[in-house]
């Protein structure tokens, strides 16, 4: 019985240590989430302005029958997917949701291999490579608060692959942050841009601009920058969802540890009570034997 009591006590101590670790990790994820949410809000100020300028310029461009390759849809022979996952685990179902969605799309639409994956995050890279899938580029070890300089190269490579007709449309697949408890899988088209902003560009109220040197030159510079800003925004959004998932997972782990501790404590008290009762019974029996 003594051995049983010591084993239960050891389990309680071990679970309490685990609970302290998961609680600390939850607090770290919570702090990261607050920073990511602020970064997302700050970025939206820039994103909304460049989207407004681009849309206003495209209103005239689309109606004039533009031939800009980033605006014009072409026959789709190959599709590019930027897939954003985490670099580490302990984030609940964050990675499994997006990877399942991507696999379903590829199995349904690209059984012939007419796709290319640009992977951001070690979990996704390892997942796709283990299955021998087409990974053109990868980025591992992304910071908790990624700067544009950190992700700029892989973003510009993705846009360049579309411009060079390595693939004919580009999507970004990621978890969109809704709140601290919820995220949604998003598969958002980035290129061609015409499909992305056509509805906005067809609205009335064109803003007049005096353009220097000319519209085409400006669009040739602006459209890649606009697309890159959309992709960067998706990365920030995905990171925010990752931190929220990590916080939720660690909170769940902490709660589960507390439940285990409560169950073990009850088990320990019952075993201790049984041991005391048995000891008293043995003492009484011994005393009776001496009479």
From Swiss-Prot:
Keywords: ATP synthesis, Cell membrane, CF(1), Hydrogen ion transport, Ion transport, Membrane, Transport. GO terms for biological process: proton motive force-driven plasma membrane ATP synthesis. Its main location: membrane. CDD domains: F1-ATPase_gamma. One of its GO terms (molecular function) is ATP binding. This is ATP synthase gamma chain. It comes from Streptococcus uberis (strain ATCC BAA-854 / 0140J). PROSITE patterns: ATPASE_GAMMA. The keyword Membrane applies. The keyword Membrane applies. InterPro entries: ATP_synth_F1_ATPase_gsu (IPR035968), ATP_synth_F1_gsu (IPR000131), ATP_synth_F1_gsu_CS (IPR023632). Produces ATP from ADP in the presence of a proton gradient across the membrane. The gamma chain is believed to be important in regulating ATPase activity and the flow of protons through the CF(0) complex. It is found in: Cell membrane. The gene is atpG. It comes from the Bacteria. It is a peripheral membrane protein. HAMAP family: ATP_synth_gamma_bact. F-type ATPases have 2 components, CF(1) - the catalytic core - and CF(0) - the membrane proton channel. CF(1) has five subunits: alpha(3), beta(3), gamma(1), delta(1), epsilon(1). CF(0) has three main subunits: a, b and c. Belongs to the ATPase gamma chain family. One of its GO terms (cellular component) is proton-transporting ATP synthase complex.
């Amino acid at each position: 019985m003594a051995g049983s009591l010591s084993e239960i006590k050891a389990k309680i101590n071990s679970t309490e240590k685990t609970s302290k670790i998961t609680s600390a990790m939850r607090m770290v994820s919570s702090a990261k989430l607050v920073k990511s949410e602020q970064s997302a809000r700050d970025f939206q100020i820039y994103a909304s302005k460049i989207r407004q300028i681009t849309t206003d310029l495209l209103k005239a461009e689309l109606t004039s029958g533009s031939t800009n390759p980033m605006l014009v849809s072409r026959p789709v022979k190959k599709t590019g997917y930027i897939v954003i996952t985490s670099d580490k685990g302990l984030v609940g179902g964050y990675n499994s949701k997006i990877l399942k969605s991507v696999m379903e799309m590829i199995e349904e639409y690209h059984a012939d291999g007419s796709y290319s994956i640009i992977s951001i995050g070690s979990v996704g890279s390892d997942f796709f490579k283990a299955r021998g899938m087409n990974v053109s580029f990868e980025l591992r070890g992304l910071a908790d608060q990624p700067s544009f300089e950190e992700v700029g190269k892989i973003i510009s490579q993705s846009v360049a692959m579309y411009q060079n007709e390595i693939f004919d449309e580009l999507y970004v697949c990621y978890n969109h942050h809704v709140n601290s408890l919820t995220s949604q899988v998003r598969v958002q088209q980035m290129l061609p841009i015409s499909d992305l902003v056509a509805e906005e560009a067809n609205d009335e109220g064109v803003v007049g601009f005096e353009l220097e040197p000319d519209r085409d030159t400006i669009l040739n510079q602006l459209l890649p920058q606009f697309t890159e800003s959309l992709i960067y925004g998706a990365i920030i959004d995905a990171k925010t969802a990752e931190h929220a998932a990590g916080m939720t997972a660690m909170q769940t782990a902490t709660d589960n540890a507390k439940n285990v501790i409560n169950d073990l404590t009850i088990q320990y008290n019952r075993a201790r009570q049984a041991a005391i009762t048995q000891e008293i019974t043995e003492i009484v029996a011994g005393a009776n034997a001496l009479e």
